[in-house]
Amino acid sequence: MAEECLARKFNLSDNYCPAYFDGLLCWDPTPWNTLAVQKCFKELYGIQYDDTQNASRLCLDGVWHNYTNYTNCTERIANGSPTDVASLIYLAGYSLSLAVLSLAVFVFLYFKDLRCLRNTIHTNLMSTYILSACSWILNLVLQNWSDESQQDQTSCMILVICMNYFYLTNFFWMLVEGLYLYMLVVETFTAENIKLKVYTTIGWGAPAVFITIWVISRCFVNVLPSTGPDGLAMFPEAKMCIWMHEHQVDWIHKAPALVGLALNLFFLIRIMWVLITKLRSANTLETEQYRKATKALLVLIPLLGITNLLVLCGPSDDSWFAYAFDYTRALMLSTQGFTVALFYCFMNTEVRHAIRYHVERWKTGRTIGGGRRRGASYSKDWSPRSRTESIRLTV
């Protein structure tokens, strides 16, 4: 584009500033002592700008002034816009999920009865939801309550890196959940061969590798120019956090997340096939078989992250359907952690029994004043883990 701009040579006298490209817009030859004005750009790095406003550059005695005035080229976000409404939905959903997930993680960590490989995987997945929600809320706060012109690039870089890492760990722990269930239900003879260390390496280690590669690549790309060809500031928003602007190298961490979702979709199909086959072989009514299969499907969808596939692509126009899709996506994605905590902790029979047992033991201790404890059906550290029960409690 710069070459095309500079090639604009008309039959002009010497009393003109030559064609000039400042890195964003092309300025045609302009008479001396004239303020050149043209429309702002519509979009820059995925961000929509108000193109009804103007940018300007001054031509003085045959030489362009060393600064282009882009002050009026502001981001197009109207008050009460669908983007604002969707952000509020995200904020409410993430806040709710954060509170419920924190309580669920506390339950799994506090009660030793619940400690097993399956619940440890659940705890790690819920932890990634918590970290992702915290980073999203922090990012929202910084974007709306901080002065963008004074944003510290180092702090912003750390926040964006952490946010992308937590998001990616979330997808990889979903993959771990899918792999664990697949090995448990489909590959029943090899399920015990995969230890917690392997799952931990997949869930926390693999995302670290992709994020490291992404950070190194991102450091070498020019995302948002802060100076023009003359070396002087040309765009006020160049002081914004450049790490928040999308770039093609972002696919380094986006692609693994999509691959993980695709694998989980495969795991879900195989698991449902095995479950439906077992239900058909059992002596149960057909309606009962459909009910159990539907229940298993609805419970597994949020655990394996299939919700993300349902709202992966949508309309981008200004129709009512596009607005409804944005709101639905915001609601489903922000409350996904809440759904996982609800299904796999608070509605889990094993968890409810463990909580009830400890509450009763606490009441008994207070009643007898620290005397002899009532006999219990199982101790605090005891937890039955047969394969059949594990499948039942998981699905």
Curated annotation (Swiss-Prot):
Membrane topology: Multi-pass membrane protein
Extracellular side: 1-87, 141-155, 218-248, 315-329
InterPro entries, alphabetized: GPCR_2, GPCR_2-like_7TM, GPCR_2_diuretic_rcpt, GPCR_2_extracell_dom_sf, GPCR_2_extracellular_dom, GPCR_2_secretin-like, GPCR_2_secretin-like_CS
Classification via Pfam families: 7tm_2 (PF00002), HRM (PF02793)
Molecular function terms from GO: diuretic hormone receptor activity; G protein-coupled peptide receptor activity; peptide hormone binding
Major location category of this protein: membrane
Biased composition (Basic and acidic residues): 382-395
Tissue: Expressed in Malpighian tubules.
Record Gene3D superfamilies: GPCR, family 2, extracellular hormone receptor domain, Rhodopsin 7-helix transmembrane proteins
Sugar-modified residues: N11, N54, N66, N69, N72, N144
Subcellular location field: Cell membrane
Cytoplasmic side: 112-119, 177-195, 273-295, 350-395
A GO biological-process term: cell surface receptor signaling pathway
Region: Disordered, residue numbers: 369-395
UniProt keyword ATP-binding present: no
GO cellular component: plasma membrane
Keyword Glycoprotein appears in the UniProt entry: yes
Keywords: Cell membrane, G-protein coupled receptor, Glycoprotein, Membrane, Receptor, Transducer, Transmembrane, Transmembrane helix
Coiled-coil features, chain-numbered ranges: none
Family label: Belongs to the G-protein coupled receptor 2 family.
Purpose: Receptor for the insect diurectic hormone. The activity of this receptor is mediated by G proteins which activate adenylyl cyclase.
PANTHER family referenced in this protein's UniProt entry, alphabetically: DIURETIC HORMONE 44 RECEPTOR 1-RELATED, PDF RECEPTOR-LIKE PROTEIN-RELATED
Protein name: Diuretic hormone receptor
Species this protein is from: Manduca sexta
Lineage, uppermost ranks: Eukaryota, Metazoa, Ecdysozoa, Arthropoda, Hexapoda
